[in-house]
């Protein structure tokens, strides 16, 4: 309990890192490289670029198609955290806990970044709790994100 402030700060930093990282990756995929590049172009860059042709296409994807790739990216980190919690002593876990909180929240928010993005393109039928979080800018609001898809800001 004495390190709760460290854990809270670490958790918030994990969320901010995920938010910044996802924005940076989106910007980089929109800006650099060619969709003709082997593997990366077809599997990574093309979906980002096609999203700007049909921004609402993401709303027609199921949960796995929307979030699966991002969840897969986080598995090594979540696996490492699981290993720490099952193999470290209580003292070692307590020493590592703020960093573990950072990694966990960063991983979870990386995993759901496409879901949050999908909600920013969904105009009907969102749960009230999602709308509240959008209205208070806790997650990406629809009106704010729309600017990204309209010239001259389109990237």
Region spans (language model):
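Membrane-interface helix-boundary signature
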Residues: 2-8, 96-99
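Membrane-embedded catalytic scaffold of the fatty acid hydroxylase/desaturase
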Residues: 13, 17-155
